[in-house]
Regions:
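A short, polar/charged loop-to-alpha-helix boundary motif
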Residues: 29-51
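ATP/NTP-dependent adenylation/nucleotidyl-transfer catalytic domains that generate, transfer
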Residues: 4-6, 44-119, 124-370
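CN hydrolase (nitrilase-like) catalytic-core segments centered on the catalytic cysteine
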Residues: 1-36
Length: 370
């Protein structure tokens, strides 16, 4: 029988399978415990085995005790469950895998509640929905931490999502803390221009707030970053990377949009507000910032990353698939430069054939990309 449950980064999907002598398959449910009773005709099994020459000389290494029950008035056909498992879509499997991985990680590590930052963006919206589905709305806490950079649109989307989910939320503005840190560091920074340093102060302030809530109440902090960001280093160490579990760590940004669409389809309503799908992705750490100011379009970025990470394509092989060479070189440079961040990130749930973590053992110091 196959195990169904989560263990750290791994999720075991169940689907125990019985194959009848005639090739008919009976498959148990996926991502949950199941119980099947199957009646196998041993005489029929022997006949099928004898038809295959390769099995005639098979020497059974394990002794099996057969118990044959004679049931009065038994029908001549074997008992089969009325309905066996039907294979689902990739998005459905991803949703159930992430829910199971999160639920078991929380339960098996002694947590009861989780907390996450709600920015009004797609990643935090999806994490919030998955957490509610896995743990129940009463066990999920959302924190909105606006600054002067945060748009009214983002605030509205975060509030609407929280109301749709029915989760308890806290609003903790970070503007005064941000100003205080800038004032504290100004004499040290002297006349150096404003840059990503000050932008990252905002992310790190939010990380401090979330970890403070975790320490005080014993809540597990959920990281909301994705595989596209972790691959390219488009995340702030000790900021939005702070937390105990990154459930989207192995999903590319393009996958996240598909999974989110599927969740709304399943619900029959816009649990994740439509505006979250329509607006341009942004970290909102400076005025007018958009992800594509620093990264290629996600459709291009994810295509390059998938070929390199999952398929082990070389730079030249990726270019041969139609990608611009300079873009590929840029993406692979980002990937290599960000190794030190990935080494310090929270564990995430593995849903691909090669995830960052146990599957990805690359050095920080030495070059590995030509």
């Amino acid at each position: 029988c196959n195990y169904a449950g989560g263990q750290d980064e791994l999720v075991f999907d169940g689907r125990s399978t019985a194959i009848m002598p005639d090739g008919h398959r009976i498959v148990a449910r996926s991502f949950e415990e199941d119980f099947l009773v199957i009646d196998i005709d041993t005489d029929q099994s022997t006949r099928y085995n004898l038809l295959e020459g390769k099995r005639k000389g098979y020497d059974r290494k394990v002794e099996v005790e057969e118990i044959n029950l004679k049931i009065p008035h038994r029908k001549s056909q074997e008992f089969l469950p009325e309905e066996t498992y039907k294979y689902s879509s990739e998005e459905d499997d991803l949703i159930r895998s992430l829910e199971l991985g999160l639920r078991d990680y929380v339960k098996k590590n002694g947590f009861k509640k989780v907390v996450l930052g709600l920015s009004g963006g797609m990643d935090s919206s999806l994490v919030a929905v998955l957490a509610v589905r896995a743990l129940g709305k009463e066990n999920v806490k959302g924190v909105m931490m606006p600054s002067r950079i945060t748009s009214d649109e983002s605030k509205k989307d975060a509030v609407e999502l929280a109301e749709n989910l029915g989760v308890e939320t806290f609003e903790i503005p970070i503007e005064s803390v941000f100003d205080s840190i800038n004032g504290l560091m100004r004499p040290v920074f002297s006349d150096r221009p404003h840059d990503v340093t000050e932008e990252n102060f905002q992310a790190r302030i939010r990380g401090i707030i979330l970890m403070g809530l975790s320490n005080k109440f014993g809540w597990l902090v959920l990281v909301t970053g994705n595989k596209s960001e972790m691959a390219t280093g488009y995340a702030t160490l000790y900021g939005d990377m702070a937390g105990g579990l990154a459930i989207l760590k192995d999903l590319y940004k393009t996958q996240i949009y598909r999974v989110a669409e599927r969740i709304n389809e399943q619900a029959g309503t816009e649990i994740i507000p439509r505006n979250v799908f329509l607006k341009a992705p942004t970290a909102e750490l400076r005025e007018g910032q958009r992800d594509q100011d620093s990264l290629p379009l996600y459709e291009i970025l994810d295509g390059i990353l998938r070929l390199y990470i999952e398929e082990s394509f070389s730079l030249d092989e990726i270019v041969s698939k139609g990608f611009d060479r300079k873009t590929v070189e840029y993406v692979l440079r980002l990937l290599q430069r960000s190794e030190y961040k990935r080494k310090q990130g929270a564990p995430g749930i593995k849903v691909s054939k090669r995830a960052f973590g146990k599957d990805w053992r690359m050095p920080i110091t030495n070059r590995y990309i030509d």
